[in-house]
Amino acid sequence: WAAGWLYLATKDNTYKTFLNTFMNASNQGKSGNSGCQWGIYSPMSWNNVSLGSAILQGEITGNASDWSKVTTYLNKKCNSESTYYCEDSWGSCRYNTAMQMAALATSKYAQSGADYTSWCKAQMSMILGNNSKNANFVVGMESNSVKYAHHRAASGYASNDEMTGQVGYSSKGHTLVGALVGGPTDSNFTYQDTIQDYKCNEVALDYNAGLVGAAAGLYNKYKTGSVDATVEGTKGTQPVVTTTTEKPVVTTTASS
């Protein structure tokens, strides 16, 4: 995956050769490959970027055979606009948005005409509140956004440790604006908004990576959307900040 990006940035064929060597290796797609299941596609995650590598190979080579590996997989996954795509019970929104990101990149670059944008739009709509729970899984975005993100530093939680039993929500707590929580554990939107349920309410950088990537892809396609003035920090030019009871320490340096 890194080799693919480096080739696009430098046009150094060394990286292209490296990418193709791995993608076309005889053991590609077999379990147990160096412990990482190389080439066994899944939504992009911290543990597996094989799908992203395949998309980059298709973009770089333009070969129909390279793209077919991607579209064959996506066709099996991105096939229902009415059912929430749930790859795993832990952090399902992370996998869902990561799949959207991959599908949108394929829709943009694949020469076969494969188009998954409508599926992605439907999935994103579910994540942002169009679901049986009427829950928006992006913290701080709307009045129906989840509140109990599993995040000690900024959760709206009244205690510094969720295991102490102090589970009351504090309106004076910090809000982790824009964070994508794990989400439902199945396609039926089984979900509980509690900080103690890390499968449903955990947050992480790789969760938001898919969210931002998918949102960018959808905007690139549909060119619609606006900044909601009710979201904290969007009414003016000041960034979203969290505050403490103590004044922050400001360090200055002499200008050079």
Question: How does the language model describe each region?
Answer:
Residues W1-T14, F18-A25, S45-S80, S89-V240:
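Aromatic (Trp/Tyr) and acidic
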Residues N24-G29, C36-P43:
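Solenoid-like repeat scaffolds
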Residues K30-S34, K77-C86:
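Acidic/His metal-coordination segments adjacent to aromatic residues that form catalytic metal sites
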Residues V241-S256:
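Extracellular mucin-like PTS domains
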